[in-house]
From Swiss-Prot:
Annotated signal sequence range: none
Annotated source species: Gluconobacter oxydans (strain 621H) (Gluconobacter suboxydans)
Name by which UniProt lists this protein: Glutamate--tRNA ligase 2
Assembly description: Monomer.
Gene Ontology annotations of biological process type: glutamyl-tRNA aminoacylation
Keyword Heme appears in the UniProt entry: no
Task of the protein: Catalyzes the attachment of glutamate to tRNA(Glu) in a two-step reaction: glutamate is first activated by ATP to form Glu-AMP and then transferred to the acceptor end of tRNA(Glu).
Subcellular localization(s) per the UniProt record: Cytoplasm
One Pfam family it belongs to: tRNA-synt_1c
GO CC terms of this entry: cytosol
Length: 444
Protein backbone atom coordinates (compact mmCIF):
# COMPACT_ATOMS: atom_id res chain seq x y z
CA UNK A 1 0.00 0.00 0.00
CA UNK A 2 1.28 3.47 -0.87
CA UNK A 3 -0.27 6.94 -0.67
CA UNK A 4 0.77 10.37 -1.82
CA UNK A 5 0.18 14.02 -1.11
CA UNK A 6 0.71 16.03 -4.28
CA UNK A 7 0.46 19.80 -3.76
CA UNK A 8 1.25 22.41 -6.40
CA UNK A 9 3.83 25.01 -5.33
CA UNK A 10 1.56 27.90 -6.31
CA UNK A 11 0.83 29.16 -2.79
CA UNK A 12 1.16 28.39 0.89
CA UNK A 13 -0.49 25.35 2.44
CA UNK A 14 -3.72 26.18 4.28
CA UNK A 15 -5.95 24.10 6.52
CA UNK A 16 -7.94 22.84 3.52
CA UNK A 17 -5.09 21.08 1.78
CA UNK A 18 -3.31 20.37 5.06
CA UNK A 19 -6.34 18.29 6.00
CA UNK A 20 -5.70 16.13 2.92
CA UNK A 21 -2.02 15.81 3.84
CA UNK A 22 -2.99 14.72 7.36
CA UNK A 23 -5.55 12.22 6.03
CA UNK A 24 -3.08 10.66 3.59
CA UNK A 25 -0.30 10.47 6.17
CA UNK A 26 -2.42 9.02 8.98
CA UNK A 27 -4.16 6.55 6.66
CA UNK A 28 -0.80 5.40 5.32
CA UNK A 29 0.86 5.02 8.72
CA UNK A 30 -2.23 3.36 10.25
CA UNK A 31 -1.95 0.69 7.57
CA UNK A 32 1.83 0.40 7.64
CA UNK A 33 2.06 1.99 4.19
CA UNK A 34 4.49 4.36 2.49
CA UNK A 35 3.78 8.09 2.22
CA UNK A 36 5.08 9.99 -0.82
CA UNK A 37 5.36 13.76 -1.15
CA UNK A 38 5.11 14.73 -4.81
CA UNK A 39 5.47 18.32 -5.92
CA UNK A 40 3.17 18.89 -8.89
CA UNK A 41 5.20 21.70 -10.42
CA UNK A 42 4.24 21.51 -14.09
CA UNK A 43 2.58 24.94 -13.86
CA UNK A 44 5.72 26.98 -14.45
CA UNK A 45 3.85 30.29 -14.69
CA UNK A 46 2.47 30.21 -11.13
CA UNK A 47 4.81 27.81 -9.35
CA UNK A 48 7.60 29.29 -7.22
CA UNK A 49 10.57 27.66 -5.43
CA UNK A 50 9.72 29.51 -2.22
CA UNK A 51 6.30 27.86 -2.15
CA UNK A 52 7.85 24.42 -2.58
CA UNK A 53 10.24 25.16 0.27
CA UNK A 54 7.33 26.34 2.41
CA UNK A 55 5.38 23.14 1.72
CA UNK A 56 8.25 21.02 3.01
CA UNK A 57 8.67 23.27 6.04
CA UNK A 58 4.96 23.18 6.88
CA UNK A 59 4.65 19.39 6.58
CA UNK A 60 7.81 18.87 8.65
CA UNK A 61 6.43 21.23 11.30
CA UNK A 62 3.23 19.17 11.44
CA UNK A 63 5.31 16.02 11.85
CA UNK A 64 4.18 14.47 8.54
CA UNK A 65 7.38 12.68 7.55
CA UNK A 66 7.46 11.47 3.97
CA UNK A 67 9.28 8.37 2.70
CA UNK A 68 9.91 9.68 -0.81
CA UNK A 69 10.13 13.13 -2.39
CA UNK A 70 9.48 13.64 -6.12
CA UNK A 71 9.10 16.63 -8.44
CA UNK A 72 7.05 16.34 -11.61
CA UNK A 73 9.42 18.77 -13.34
CA UNK A 74 12.11 16.08 -13.15
CA UNK A 75 9.97 13.57 -15.08
CA UNK A 76 9.31 15.45 -18.31
CA UNK A 77 11.05 12.83 -20.48
CA UNK A 78 8.79 10.14 -19.08
CA UNK A 79 5.70 12.26 -19.75
CA UNK A 80 6.82 12.88 -23.34
CA UNK A 81 7.17 9.13 -23.84
CA UNK A 82 3.61 8.47 -22.63
CA UNK A 83 2.21 11.38 -24.64
CA UNK A 84 3.63 9.90 -27.84
CA UNK A 85 2.13 6.53 -26.94
CA UNK A 86 -1.32 8.06 -26.49
CA UNK A 87 -0.99 10.01 -29.73
CA UNK A 88 -0.04 6.85 -31.59
CA UNK A 89 -3.05 4.99 -30.20
CA UNK A 90 -5.39 7.78 -31.24
CA UNK A 91 -6.48 8.60 -27.70
CA UNK A 92 -4.78 12.01 -27.84
CA UNK A 93 -5.95 14.10 -30.78
CA UNK A 94 -4.89 17.60 -31.91
CA UNK A 95 -7.24 20.57 -31.61
CA UNK A 96 -6.66 23.96 -33.22
CA UNK A 97 -9.58 26.04 -31.89
CA UNK A 98 -8.74 29.30 -30.18
CA UNK A 99 -10.18 30.21 -26.79
CA UNK A 100 -12.51 32.64 -28.57
CA UNK A 101 -13.80 29.90 -30.87
CA UNK A 102 -14.32 27.50 -27.98
CA UNK A 103 -16.29 30.10 -26.03
CA UNK A 104 -18.48 30.78 -29.07
CA UNK A 105 -19.19 27.05 -29.44
CA UNK A 106 -20.00 26.77 -25.75
CA UNK A 107 -22.47 29.67 -25.87
CA UNK A 108 -24.11 28.28 -29.01
CA UNK A 109 -24.67 24.90 -27.36
CA UNK A 110 -26.19 26.59 -24.32
CA UNK A 111 -28.57 28.59 -26.53
CA UNK A 112 -29.55 25.34 -28.26
CA UNK A 113 -30.34 23.73 -24.92
CA UNK A 114 -27.37 21.37 -25.11
CA UNK A 115 -24.73 20.62 -22.50
CA UNK A 116 -21.78 23.03 -22.93
CA UNK A 117 -19.23 20.31 -23.63
CA UNK A 118 -16.68 20.02 -26.41
CA UNK A 119 -18.21 18.79 -29.69
CA UNK A 120 -15.19 16.74 -30.81
CA UNK A 121 -15.08 18.64 -34.09
CA UNK A 122 -11.33 18.13 -34.37
CA UNK A 123 -11.74 14.35 -34.40
CA UNK A 124 -12.97 14.79 -37.98
CA UNK A 125 -9.87 16.74 -38.97
CA UNK A 126 -8.15 15.29 -42.03
CA UNK A 127 -4.40 15.09 -42.48
CA UNK A 128 -4.57 17.85 -45.11
CA UNK A 129 -6.58 20.14 -42.83
CA UNK A 130 -4.10 19.60 -40.01
CA UNK A 131 -1.16 20.31 -42.33
CA UNK A 132 -2.77 23.57 -43.50
CA UNK A 133 -3.43 24.65 -39.93
CA UNK A 134 0.17 24.02 -38.96
CA UNK A 135 1.41 25.75 -42.12
CA UNK A 136 -0.56 28.80 -41.01
CA UNK A 137 1.40 28.85 -37.75
CA UNK A 138 -1.20 27.20 -35.55
CA UNK A 139 0.00 24.82 -32.85
CA UNK A 140 -2.50 22.34 -31.45
CA UNK A 141 -3.44 21.51 -27.93
CA UNK A 142 -4.19 17.84 -27.39
CA UNK A 143 -7.38 16.37 -26.00
CA UNK A 144 -7.91 12.88 -24.62
CA UNK A 145 -10.76 11.00 -26.29
CA UNK A 146 -12.85 9.70 -23.42
CA UNK A 147 -14.44 6.27 -23.62
CA UNK A 148 -18.18 5.81 -23.98
CA UNK A 149 -20.22 4.93 -20.91
CA UNK A 150 -19.34 5.58 -17.29
CA UNK A 151 -16.56 4.90 -14.84
CA UNK A 152 -17.59 3.55 -11.44
CA UNK A 153 -15.73 2.83 -8.23
CA UNK A 154 -16.43 2.01 -4.60
CA UNK A 155 -15.27 5.02 -2.65
CA UNK A 156 -14.01 4.63 0.93
CA UNK A 157 -15.99 7.72 1.97
CA UNK A 158 -18.66 8.38 -0.69
CA UNK A 159 -19.54 4.69 -1.25
CA UNK A 160 -20.49 3.93 -4.87
CA UNK A 161 -19.50 6.71 -7.28
CA UNK A 162 -20.10 6.99 -11.01
CA UNK A 163 -19.01 9.50 -13.63
CA UNK A 164 -20.75 9.55 -17.02
CA UNK A 165 -17.92 10.25 -19.44
CA UNK A 166 -20.23 11.18 -22.32
CA UNK A 167 -21.52 14.09 -20.24
CA UNK A 168 -18.16 15.84 -19.97
CA UNK A 169 -15.69 17.33 -22.42
CA UNK A 170 -12.67 15.44 -23.66
CA UNK A 171 -10.01 16.96 -21.38
CA UNK A 172 -7.02 18.90 -22.69
CA UNK A 173 -3.96 16.98 -21.47
CA UNK A 174 -1.22 18.75 -23.44
CA UNK A 175 -1.10 22.52 -23.92
CA UNK A 176 -0.31 24.26 -27.17
CA UNK A 177 3.26 24.84 -26.00
CA UNK A 178 3.69 21.12 -25.45
CA UNK A 179 3.58 21.16 -21.66
CA UNK A 180 1.63 18.48 -19.87
CA UNK A 181 -1.34 19.16 -17.62
CA UNK A 182 -1.76 17.80 -14.11
CA UNK A 183 -4.59 15.46 -15.14
CA UNK A 184 -2.26 13.26 -17.21
CA UNK A 185 0.98 13.76 -15.28
CA UNK A 186 -0.73 12.67 -12.07
CA UNK A 187 -1.96 9.40 -13.58
CA UNK A 188 1.46 8.59 -15.05
CA UNK A 189 3.09 9.26 -11.68
CA UNK A 190 0.54 7.28 -9.70
CA UNK A 191 1.04 4.26 -11.98
CA UNK A 192 4.83 4.51 -12.14
CA UNK A 193 5.27 5.12 -8.41
CA UNK A 194 3.04 2.30 -7.26
CA UNK A 195 0.37 4.46 -5.63
CA UNK A 196 -2.48 2.23 -4.48
CA UNK A 197 -4.80 4.58 -2.56
CA UNK A 198 -5.71 8.14 -3.53
CA UNK A 199 -7.25 10.32 -0.81
CA UNK A 200 -8.38 13.76 -1.98
CA UNK A 201 -11.25 16.25 -1.94
CA UNK A 202 -14.70 15.57 -3.33
CA UNK A 203 -14.14 18.34 -5.88
CA UNK A 204 -12.02 15.76 -7.73
CA UNK A 205 -14.82 13.21 -8.22
CA UNK A 206 -15.36 14.03 -11.91
CA UNK A 207 -11.61 14.19 -12.39
CA UNK A 208 -11.34 10.71 -10.88
CA UNK A 209 -13.66 9.27 -13.52
CA UNK A 210 -11.51 10.85 -16.22
CA UNK A 211 -8.27 9.64 -14.66
CA UNK A 212 -9.55 6.08 -14.33
CA UNK A 213 -10.21 6.17 -18.08
CA UNK A 214 -6.72 7.53 -18.74
CA UNK A 215 -5.17 4.87 -16.50
CA UNK A 216 -7.02 2.15 -18.41
CA UNK A 217 -5.75 3.62 -21.69
CA UNK A 218 -2.25 3.18 -20.26
CA UNK A 219 -2.90 -0.46 -19.44
CA UNK A 220 -4.20 -0.33 -15.87
CA UNK A 221 -7.11 -2.45 -14.70
CA UNK A 222 -10.38 -0.64 -13.82
CA UNK A 223 -9.90 -1.21 -10.08
CA UNK A 224 -6.18 -0.42 -10.02
CA UNK A 225 -6.62 2.45 -7.54
CA UNK A 226 -8.69 2.70 -4.37
CA UNK A 227 -10.20 6.16 -3.90
CA UNK A 228 -11.42 8.15 -0.91
CA UNK A 229 -12.97 11.56 -1.55
CA UNK A 230 -13.24 13.76 1.54
CA UNK A 231 -16.09 16.31 1.66
CA UNK A 232 -15.09 19.93 1.30
CA UNK A 233 -14.02 21.93 4.31
CA UNK A 234 -16.16 25.06 4.74
CA UNK A 235 -15.79 27.99 7.10
CA UNK A 236 -17.83 28.17 10.30
CA UNK A 237 -20.68 29.95 8.48
CA UNK A 238 -20.86 27.35 5.72
CA UNK A 239 -19.12 29.57 3.17
CA UNK A 240 -16.08 28.87 1.04
CA UNK A 241 -12.91 28.51 3.03
CA UNK A 242 -10.92 29.97 0.14
CA UNK A 243 -11.92 33.48 1.19
CA UNK A 244 -9.86 33.03 4.36
CA UNK A 245 -6.87 31.09 2.99
CA UNK A 246 -4.36 33.80 3.93
CA UNK A 247 -5.34 33.81 7.61
CA UNK A 248 -5.64 30.01 7.65
CA UNK A 249 -2.30 29.28 6.00
CA UNK A 250 -0.13 26.99 8.11
CA UNK A 251 2.51 29.69 8.00
CA UNK A 252 0.09 32.12 9.67
CA UNK A 253 -1.12 29.58 12.24
CA UNK A 254 2.48 28.78 13.16
CA UNK A 255 3.30 32.48 13.58
CA UNK A 256 0.16 32.89 15.69
CA UNK A 257 1.49 30.26 18.09
CA UNK A 258 -0.66 27.20 17.44
CA UNK A 259 0.83 23.82 18.32
CA UNK A 260 1.35 21.49 15.34
CA UNK A 261 -0.29 18.51 17.07
CA UNK A 262 -3.33 20.64 17.88
CA UNK A 263 -3.75 21.23 14.15
CA UNK A 264 -3.10 17.57 13.25
CA UNK A 265 -5.49 16.38 15.97
CA UNK A 266 -8.20 18.75 14.80
CA UNK A 267 -7.84 18.06 11.07
CA UNK A 268 -7.77 14.31 11.71
CA UNK A 269 -11.22 14.45 13.29
CA UNK A 270 -13.02 17.40 11.67
CA UNK A 271 -15.99 16.21 9.64
CA UNK A 272 -16.00 12.77 11.22
CA UNK A 273 -18.02 10.97 13.87
CA UNK A 274 -15.05 11.21 16.25
CA UNK A 275 -14.85 14.15 18.63
CA UNK A 276 -11.66 16.22 18.28
CA UNK A 277 -9.18 15.70 21.10
CA UNK A 278 -5.52 16.46 21.61
CA UNK A 279 -3.43 13.46 20.59
CA UNK A 280 0.19 12.56 20.11
CA UNK A 281 1.15 11.55 16.59
CA UNK A 282 1.24 7.87 17.61
CA UNK A 283 -2.24 8.18 19.10
CA UNK A 284 -3.55 9.95 15.98
CA UNK A 285 -2.12 7.21 13.74
CA UNK A 286 -3.56 4.41 15.85
CA UNK A 287 -7.01 6.04 16.06
CA UNK A 288 -7.41 7.12 12.44
CA UNK A 289 -10.39 5.50 10.72
CA UNK A 290 -11.36 6.88 7.32
CA UNK A 291 -14.72 5.09 7.49
CA UNK A 292 -15.72 7.55 10.22
CA UNK A 293 -15.51 10.51 7.81
CA UNK A 294 -18.94 11.97 7.06
CA UNK A 295 -20.23 12.38 3.51
CA UNK A 296 -21.40 15.89 4.38
CA UNK A 297 -19.23 18.98 4.13
CA UNK A 298 -17.23 19.72 7.25
CA UNK A 299 -16.96 23.13 8.88
CA UNK A 300 -13.70 24.55 10.10
CA UNK A 301 -14.22 26.04 13.56
CA UNK A 302 -11.33 28.19 14.76
CA UNK A 303 -12.88 28.39 18.23
CA UNK A 304 -12.73 24.61 18.51
CA UNK A 305 -9.15 24.52 17.24
CA UNK A 306 -8.11 27.16 19.76
CA UNK A 307 -9.78 25.17 22.54
CA UNK A 308 -7.73 22.13 21.51
CA UNK A 309 -4.61 24.25 21.42
CA UNK A 310 -5.36 25.59 24.88
CA UNK A 311 -5.67 22.05 26.22
CA UNK A 312 -2.46 21.03 24.52
CA UNK A 313 -0.49 23.91 26.03
CA UNK A 314 -2.00 23.51 29.48
CA UNK A 315 -0.67 19.95 29.56
CA UNK A 316 2.58 20.50 27.68
CA UNK A 317 5.59 19.21 29.67
CA UNK A 318 8.44 21.63 30.29
CA UNK A 319 10.83 19.71 28.03
CA UNK A 320 8.43 20.04 25.10
CA UNK A 321 7.67 23.67 25.91
CA UNK A 322 11.32 24.76 25.85
CA UNK A 323 11.19 25.63 22.15
CA UNK A 324 8.66 28.37 22.99
CA UNK A 325 10.39 29.72 26.11
CA UNK A 326 13.17 32.26 26.66
CA UNK A 327 16.50 30.51 27.39
CA UNK A 328 16.40 31.73 31.00
CA UNK A 329 12.94 30.31 31.70
CA UNK A 330 12.76 27.40 34.11
CA UNK A 331 10.16 24.76 34.87
CA UNK A 332 8.62 26.82 37.65
CA UNK A 333 7.88 29.67 35.26
CA UNK A 334 6.32 27.35 32.68
CA UNK A 335 4.12 25.57 35.21
CA UNK A 336 3.05 28.97 36.55
CA UNK A 337 1.94 30.44 33.22
CA UNK A 338 0.91 27.49 31.01
CA UNK A 339 -2.64 27.50 32.36
CA UNK A 340 -3.04 31.06 31.09
CA UNK A 341 -1.82 30.74 27.51
CA UNK A 342 -4.02 29.81 24.57
CA UNK A 343 -1.21 30.28 22.04
CA UNK A 344 2.53 29.91 22.42
CA UNK A 345 2.84 33.45 21.02
CA UNK A 346 1.39 34.68 24.34
CA UNK A 347 4.27 33.26 26.40
CA UNK A 348 6.61 36.26 25.89
CA UNK A 349 3.92 38.49 27.37
CA UNK A 350 3.94 36.55 30.63
CA UNK A 351 7.73 36.52 30.66
CA UNK A 352 7.63 40.32 30.46
CA UNK A 353 5.00 40.43 33.21
CA UNK A 354 7.34 38.51 35.50
CA UNK A 355 10.73 39.86 34.46
CA UNK A 356 10.15 42.96 32.36
CA UNK A 357 8.60 46.38 32.78
CA UNK A 358 4.87 46.84 33.26
CA UNK A 359 2.64 49.90 33.38
CA UNK A 360 0.36 49.51 36.40
CA UNK A 361 -3.12 51.03 36.10
CA UNK A 362 -4.00 53.92 38.36
CA UNK A 363 -5.81 52.84 41.56
CA UNK A 364 -6.34 56.07 43.52
CA UNK A 365 -8.92 54.48 45.83
CA UNK A 366 -6.45 51.72 46.77
CA UNK A 367 -3.25 53.73 47.23
CA UNK A 368 -3.40 53.60 51.01
CA UNK A 369 -3.97 49.85 50.91
CA UNK A 370 -1.04 49.35 48.50
CA UNK A 371 1.20 51.47 50.74
CA UNK A 372 0.20 49.26 53.65
CA UNK A 373 0.96 46.19 51.52
CA UNK A 374 4.41 47.60 50.75
CA UNK A 375 5.08 48.36 54.40
CA UNK A 376 4.14 44.85 55.51
CA UNK A 377 5.90 42.97 52.68
CA UNK A 378 7.96 40.22 54.36
CA UNK A 379 11.71 40.31 54.22
CA UNK A 380 13.60 37.68 52.26
CA UNK A 381 14.22 34.77 52.13
CA UNK A 382 10.84 33.89 50.71
CA UNK A 383 9.24 30.48 50.61
CA UNK A 384 6.01 28.77 49.64
CA UNK A 385 4.13 30.35 52.56
CA UNK A 386 5.23 33.95 51.91
CA UNK A 387 2.20 34.94 49.85
CA UNK A 388 -0.21 33.34 52.29
CA UNK A 389 1.43 34.92 55.34
CA UNK A 390 1.53 38.35 53.68
CA UNK A 391 -2.09 38.38 52.46
CA UNK A 392 -3.40 36.92 55.74
CA UNK A 393 -1.74 39.78 57.59
CA UNK A 394 -3.19 42.30 55.14
CA UNK A 395 -6.62 40.74 55.48
CA UNK A 396 -6.53 40.93 59.25
CA UNK A 397 -5.17 44.48 59.39
CA UNK A 398 -7.26 46.03 56.58
CA UNK A 399 -10.47 44.09 56.96
CA UNK A 400 -10.43 43.40 53.23
CA UNK A 401 -11.12 40.01 51.72
CA UNK A 402 -11.78 38.37 48.38
CA UNK A 403 -11.64 40.62 45.33
CA UNK A 404 -11.08 43.83 47.28
CA UNK A 405 -8.00 42.24 48.84
CA UNK A 406 -6.46 40.46 45.86
CA UNK A 407 -7.36 42.58 42.80
CA UNK A 408 -5.40 45.71 43.80
CA UNK A 409 -2.36 43.49 44.40
CA UNK A 410 -2.75 41.69 41.07
CA UNK A 411 -3.11 44.96 39.16
CA UNK A 412 -0.12 46.46 40.93
CA UNK A 413 2.17 43.45 40.51
CA UNK A 414 1.21 42.33 37.00
CA UNK A 415 -0.75 45.13 35.35
CA UNK A 416 -3.40 42.51 34.52
CA UNK A 417 -6.80 41.78 36.04
CA UNK A 418 -6.37 38.03 35.51
CA UNK A 419 -3.52 35.60 35.14
CA UNK A 420 -1.40 32.96 36.85
CA UNK A 421 -1.53 32.30 40.58
CA UNK A 422 0.01 35.25 42.40
CA UNK A 423 1.64 33.12 45.07
CA UNK A 424 3.81 31.55 42.35
CA UNK A 425 4.46 34.80 40.49
CA UNK A 426 5.57 36.49 43.71
CA UNK A 427 8.37 33.98 44.12
CA UNK A 428 9.41 34.36 40.48
CA UNK A 429 9.49 38.16 40.67
CA UNK A 430 11.41 38.38 43.94
CA UNK A 431 11.24 41.05 46.61
CA UNK A 432 13.16 43.79 44.79
CA UNK A 433 10.85 43.75 41.76
CA UNK A 434 7.77 43.41 43.97
CA UNK A 435 8.78 46.49 45.96
CA UNK A 436 9.43 48.48 42.77
CA UNK A 437 6.05 47.56 41.31
CA UNK A 438 4.15 48.41 44.47
CA UNK A 439 5.86 51.81 44.53
CA UNK A 440 5.03 52.40 40.86
CA UNK A 441 1.40 51.44 41.49
CA UNK A 442 1.14 53.81 44.44
CA UNK A 443 2.43 56.68 42.30
CA UNK A 444 0.36 55.80 39.20
Amino acid sequence: MKLRFAPSPTGYLHVGNARLAVANFLFARHNGAKFLLRIDDTDTTRGKPEYEEAIGKDLSWLGLKWDEYVRQSERLDRYAEVIEKLKASGRLYPCFETEYELNAKREARIRAGKAPIYDRAMLKLTADQRARAEANGKTPHWRFRLSDGSRKWQDLVMDECSVKLTAISDPVLVRGDGTILYTLASVIDDLDMGITHIVRGEDHVTNTGVQIDIAEALGAKPDHFTFAHLPLLLDSDGGKLSKRFDSLALKSLRQDGLEPMSIVSYLARVGSSDDPQVMTMDEAIAAYDISHVSKSAARFDMTQLLALNRRALHNLPFEDAKIHLPPEADETFWHAVRGNVDLSAEIPHWWDVVHGTIIPPSQPEDRAFLQHALDTLPAEPWGEETWKDWTNALKEQSGRKGRSLFMPLRLALTGEDAGPELHVLLGLMGRERTVARLRDAIQA
